[in-house]
Each structure stands twice: as structure tokens, then as C-alpha cells.
Amino acid sequence: MVGMGDRLFNMVFTRRPPQSMSRCISDPGYRAAARFSYEEASAQYKVYVERLHSAGITVKELGPLEDYPDSVFIQDTAVIGGGSRVAVLARFGAPSRRGEEGHVVSILSSMGLEIHPVKPPGTLEGGDVLVTGEGVVFAGLSSRTNREGVETLKTAFPNVNVETLNAKGLHLLSHLGYLGKATLISAEGLYDKSIFKRHGFDLIEIPWEERDAANLLYLGEGRVLLPAGYNQTRDLLEQHGFRIVEAEIRQFMACMGGVTCLSLPIYNIL
């Protein structure tokens, strides 16, 4: 049963999509999902922001960065702790994205946060960091994040248990999500349930063909922001008592992005 008052964050940053997003990092399988349209991407971004506002979340919108085609995926730039007043500043594993993080430094500094930058040879992107409300943070090792980067995360947030596992996708959050109340979601057979069970987490498994739906955003109080078009996942979550809000983000999924990628939360628990 889903509880109340379990929201992980009350405020997020978002960044408007640049026209250069047509040159985003992707692969043919994802690129085929949608022909790029700046107008359509902008409209989908606007609806996404409206969904967050409707859930009572404060959204601070930042302007587009034309020099960085993937910059709309602002989640990757940092991991921000609202309780500790600490932020880990990313060092991108994707060389073409290095420099994006510099555009959030002044914002983090203006908030009075203690900034822990990931230093070479470390790499860490926010999409590999799954924060939960149970004092456990799952950090994914991927082509974008390495062990040195995760060590920076552990040092910055000693108040939580940072557990490392191999990401089964571009990022850990590509196919693994958090649903509140010690519950995770992923595609069937993708992760060994025992990895999470030993930390007290249940795992809801969705059909393999809808694995991208696991990149969802838990809004608290049983509400889930889900990418549109994943009907089996929506029905399954509703059976578990969740209230589903959908957002069409096909333009961003064509760039291998998802619901979590489009916002940078200030986590209450960190």
C-alpha cells in the first residue's frame, strides 16, 4: 500500500531544449522513435513542466544551451542534497557533454551549497544515481560512471548507504526506478531481485518490451509520472495502487532520455 508524505524532493531545476538537440547522442534504435522537431520537443517539455507543477513541485527553469545538444537532460549534471546542503558536481563520461556541469556551478554556489566536484579519472553522471527514501542510494557503474566517481558520491553523502551495482543500460535509471516505500521497478529478468531484497526493497517487474517505462518519476503520495504509451506498465502500477500521470516525451526518448533525465531534483533525504 502506498503511503503519504514520502516525496523525495519539493523543487527541481529543468533546462529548456536547445534547437541543437537534433545532434543529441543516440543510437539508431532510439533515433527511429521520432523524427526530431524542435517545436514538438518544446511542446513536450512544456507539458512535462506542467505535470511537475500540478504535483506541487517547484520548478526552476533554465535557458537552453545551444552548444550542448544533450543539455536538456539536466539530471546528469549534479546530485544535490537539500538536507546536507551538499552537491556533487558531475564529470561526464561522455566527452561531448563535458562543460554542461559548469553552467550549474553558479546556481549551486548561489544556494550556499558545498560543492564536491568529481575529479579525473573519476566520472559520474546523475542518471546513474538512484536515490530512495530508505537511506539507500544505488549507484550504477556504466559507460558514463566509474568507481572513482562513485567514491566522490560516498564521501559527499556519508549519511546514506551508497550501494554500487552494474547498470543494465545507458544509465542505471534507464531501466530502474523508485516508487516510494522501499519499492523499485524494472524489466523482468534484468536485475537479480536479491540485490535489492538484501537492502529491504521489493521489485516490481514489467514486461521486457516496456523496459523504458522504468525510467519514471515518483512524485510522492502514490503519484507516478510515467512516459506515455506504456499501457501494460500503467495498468500494473494502477493494480498496485499507484495514481498515474502520463507525459508524452517521445522526442526526448529518441535521444535516449527519459522522465527522470529532464529534471535535477534537490533531494530532501541527502
Curated annotation (Swiss-Prot):
EC numbers on record: 3.5.3.-
GO annotation (BP), single: positive regulation of nitric oxide biosynthetic process
Leading EC class: hydrolase
Pfam families listed in its UniProt record: DDAH_eukar
Entries under Gene3D superfamilies matching the protein: L-arginine/glycine Amidinotransferase, Chain A
SUPFAM superfamilies the UniProt entry points to: Pentein
Keywords: Hydrolase
Transmembrane region(s): none
Residues annotated as the enzyme's active site: H171 (proton donor), C261 (nucleophile)
GO molecular function (one): amino acid binding
InterPro entries: DDAH-like (IPR033199)
PANTHER family, sorted: DIMETHYLARGININASE (PTHR12737:SF9), DIMETHYLARGININE DIMETHYLAMINOHYDROLASE (PTHR12737)
Similarity comment text for this entry: Belongs to the DDAH family.
The protein, known as: Uncharacterized protein APE_2601.1
